């Protein structure tokens, strides 16, 4: 077997629920100032689910659609791995439910299970799949990686940053989006910025301000680690590797970020600029950033609003060209936890000039509270046009049903009633589901879930 080349994403599909909440209406409903969510967080709409959809139904819909749209033979898949932080069972994996899409075709030889670590699980599953294809264990088949989640909060202040969705990715050689193994920075640590210790409820415990600082701090450390790795690689190759310099932003043409909210993405890009400036000996790199902000202590720099605003302003033009396409869809969808970064990636490729995209490098930042993070690179190694056309994300988002805050609150109440329950018949309306969507039909007395498919 020849060594596989250009291993990465060969195809992608995304599924979002058919209903969404207008954040402008939600601002009025919650009695906050106009623009707090739409401008302050950069969020226009938010996907949400009733009790008819769960992490498994979202995944079933996305994977079945991926197989259908891209004419993938279920027998051609040798690994199936799920990243999620919304499990409905402490032992039985979401992946086990997805085997129902493959077993009827005679395929029960499917490696991989679920990977759980907050919003980072999808990225870990992606790396596992790529490593499998590049390993001696590879049997020549492709892999599918699934990132599926529902983000729901108890506190009113956090609810605007909810959302729901699933991204499924076909992984293999000769991909159109290939991972760049030389472009990776990793940071892992122990934090309590966001966690879910109460198994009786769907809600997390969140320290919002600490979580933002943890996110930005992780980005800083990934920046450092990526530079350390690229410099080490150059030394190992006796200087034969292309020079990367000391600026991480010079390594990428575009960027996509894990997106709890869109405002955090603009702060993050500015933060990368700040780290590049700290590593630079060229005074011109600090242009637009006042002198008094250049020597802040590290702790102060994470929370200094004047520095934050200066960095966002200094990178505004670059951000618009290199990053803004990645938040077009997240601003209309909200947070999808593990699927968030990959929704951003789909948004990016759906909103750039594909004619000139081949050969470009995309930087991606993945963060999961607790905390796990990686800043890594992908290269466009093929024509993305077919994939973007088949995903058709931006058009599909316009077809959702915009519902009222009262409808959203009712849906939340249904989910609260259903969570952890048995002998339960879901009450949510299925009429708005599109044909081919999987939904929860019932939960029996032994907690076993039955799913149905919306017909024509």
UniProtKB/Swiss-Prot annotation:
Summarize where (3S)-3-hydroxy-3-methylglutaryl-CoA binds, as residue positions: 34, 119, 161, 211, 258, 267, 335, 369
Q: Tell me which CDD domains the record gives.
A: init_cond_enzymes
| Reaction equation(s) it catalyzes | acetoacetyl-CoA + acetyl-CoA + H2O = (3S)-3-hydroxy-3-methylglutaryl-CoA + CoA + H(+)
EC number from the UniProt entry: 2.3.3.10
List of catalytic residues:
85, 119, 258
Inducing factors: Expression is increased upon exposure to hygromycin B.
| Matches recorded under Gene3D superfamilies | 3.40.47.10
Its annotated function is as follows: HMG-CoA synthase; part of the gene cluster that mediates the biosynthesis of 1233A, a natural compound known as an inhibitor of HMG-CoA synthase in the mevalonate pathway and with antibacterial and antifungal activities. This enzyme condenses acetyl-CoA with acetoacetyl-CoA to form HMG-CoA, which is the substrate for HMG-CoA reductase. As part of the 1233A biosynthesis cluster, is involved in conferring self-resistance to 1233A.
Report the sequence similarity comment from the record.
Answer: Belongs to the thiolase-like superfamily. HMG-CoA synthase family.
User: Which protein is depicted?
Assistant: Hydroxymethylglutaryl coenzyme A synthase
**Source organism of this protein record:** Fusarium sp
């Amino acid at each position: 077997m020849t060594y596989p080349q250009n291993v990465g994403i060969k195809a992608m599909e995304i599924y979002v629920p058919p209903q969404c909440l207008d954040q402008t209406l939600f601002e009025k409903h919650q009695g906050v100032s106009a623009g707090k969510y739409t401008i302050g967080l950069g969020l226009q709409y938010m996907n949400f689910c009733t009790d008819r959809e769960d992490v498994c139904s979202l995944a079933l819909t996305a994977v079945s659609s991926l197989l259908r749209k891209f004419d993938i033979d279920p027998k051609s898949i040798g690994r199936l791995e799920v990243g999620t932080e919304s499990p409905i069972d402490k032992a039985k994996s979401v992946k086990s439910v997805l085997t129902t899409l493959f077993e009827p075709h005679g395929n029960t030889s499917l490696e991989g299970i679920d990977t759980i670590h907050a919003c980072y699980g999808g990225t870990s599953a992606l790396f596992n799949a790529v490593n499998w294809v590049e390993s001696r264990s590879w049997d020549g088949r492709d892999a599918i990686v699934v990132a599926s989640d529902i983000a729901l909060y108890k506190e009113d202040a956090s609810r605007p940053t909810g959302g729901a969705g699933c991204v499924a990715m076909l992984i293999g050689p000769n991909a159109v989006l290939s991972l760049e193994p030389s472009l990776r920075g990793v940071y892992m640590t122990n934090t309590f910025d966001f966690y879910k210790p109460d198994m009786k409820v769907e809600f997390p415990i969140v320290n919002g301000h600490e979580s933002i600082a943890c996110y930005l701090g992780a980005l800083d450390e990934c920046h450092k680690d990526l530079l350390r790795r690229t410099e080490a690689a150059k030394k190992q190759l006796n200087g034969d590797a292309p020079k990367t310099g000391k600026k991480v932003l010079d390594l990428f043409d575009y960027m996509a970020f894990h997106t709890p909210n869109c405002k955090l993405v603009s702060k993050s890009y500015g933060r990368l600029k700040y780290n590049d400036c700290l590593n630079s000996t060229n005074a011109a790199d600090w242009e637009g950033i006042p002198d008094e902000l250049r020597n802040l202590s590290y702790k102060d720099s994470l929370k200094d609003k004047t520095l934050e605003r200066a960095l966002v302003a200094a990178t505004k033009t670059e951000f618009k060209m290199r990053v803004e396409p990645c938040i077009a869809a997240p601003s209309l969808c909200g947070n999808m936890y593990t699927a968030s970064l990959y929704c951003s990636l789909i948004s990016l490729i759906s909103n750039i000039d594909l004619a000139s995209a081949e050969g470009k490098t995309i930087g991606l930042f993945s963060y999961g509270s607790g905390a796990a993070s990686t800043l890594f690179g992908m290269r466009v190694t093929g024509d993305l046009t077919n994939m973007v056309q088949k995903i058709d994300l931006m058009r599909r988002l316009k077809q959702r049903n915009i519902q009222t805050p009262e409808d959203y609150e009712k849906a939340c109440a249904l989910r609260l009633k259903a969570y952890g329950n048995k002998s339960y018949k879901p009450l949510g309306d299925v009429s708005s589901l599109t044909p081919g969507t999987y939904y929860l039909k019932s939960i029996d007395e032994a907690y076993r879930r039955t799913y149905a498919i919306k017909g024509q």
